[in-house]
Amino acid sequence: MEHPKVSVIVPIYNVEKYLDECMLSLLNQTLEDIEIILVDDESPDNCPKMCDEYANKDKRVKVVHKKNGGLGFARNSGLDVATGEYVAFIDSDDFIDLDMMEHLYNVATEYNADEVRCGIKFYVGGKFTERHDVDKLTVFRGKEQVVDFMLDVVGPLPKCKRDVKYMMSSCCCIHSRKVIEDNHIRFLSERECLSEDLIWDIDLFSKMNCVVYVPECHYAYRMNPSSLTHQYSREKYQRNYNFFEILEEKLAGILAKEKYELHLLRSQMLYFRNSISGFVHNNGNVKDDVRYVLNDNFWKRLFSLYPFKRLPLKQRVYYTLAKLKSPTLMIILAKLK
């Protein structure tokens, strides 16, 4: 198998409990012409041995053992050895429908797409909740349409009822490896940048000519409260600053400020709400942490810039109450969500 249709890159760290379920969904894909690259990020459990066992049983499986460096750098290590026409990223505690790769690859071929993405279904307590961002196959063709899509991934315009119009994820898609390699695109470290996926999306979309979105929810995202993405701290909160600095720098490099500003501000507003929610649902001194966010000058500037009157009623009420800077009130609102 010299050049498979899809290289599936799976970063692995401390997921012994879930790895078999993930791998079963990959090894049994209806599209057999794939390679599966397992990147062991110096996992402290039995995962390194499990990876080697998978490689011994199936020639489509490659294993990379590396020093621990985090999710973004593990994905980069997978990219360095990938040979497929397209690349997919799957988190090792998640799993996918058995026909996901075949469906996305066939669509990519039919539309000559640089990326094809699908919907996500959230998996918790043995039950699925699907999220549909499109209700039919949707094609974004040409630089202008792809950039408009990219901006809606960053954040929707004020009139949009959803805080997230299109899910930001590198996992529910296949990406052209040629676009990635021709433009030397790689992930930042999530240890420095709060959302390496969104920065990756911008780097990619700015170089793409066709993105296709299918409505089927092929990707099962495991809602694991103890996982890295569900832990919140002031250190993680501080990474907001670095993230938004990088995000605006990326956007300013390809667009005029008036084109991206409202999208960026809406994204920042969502991170404000998520920061409040993160502290409320974390163990710690909740009231002090929420007060810490409310008194941050970063949000004061945001509140002075954004046209709140153009928001849907629910969001307008929330941010009006946030201006009162009452930790107790914001804690109540977060718990009601």
Where are these regions (language model features)?
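Donor-binding/catalytic cores of nucleotide-activated saccharide
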Residues: 71, 92-212, 219-232
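Glycine-rich, basic loop-to-helix element that forms the pyrophosphate-binding segment
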Residues: 66-82
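Short, well-formed alpha-helical segments that are part of the catalytic scaffolds
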Residues: 14-28
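Catalytic core of nucleotide-sugar-dependent glycosyltransferases
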Residues: 216-224, 230-257, 273-302
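Membrane-interface aromatic/basic loop that binds lipid-linked glycans or pyrophosphate carriers
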Residues: 113, 279-337
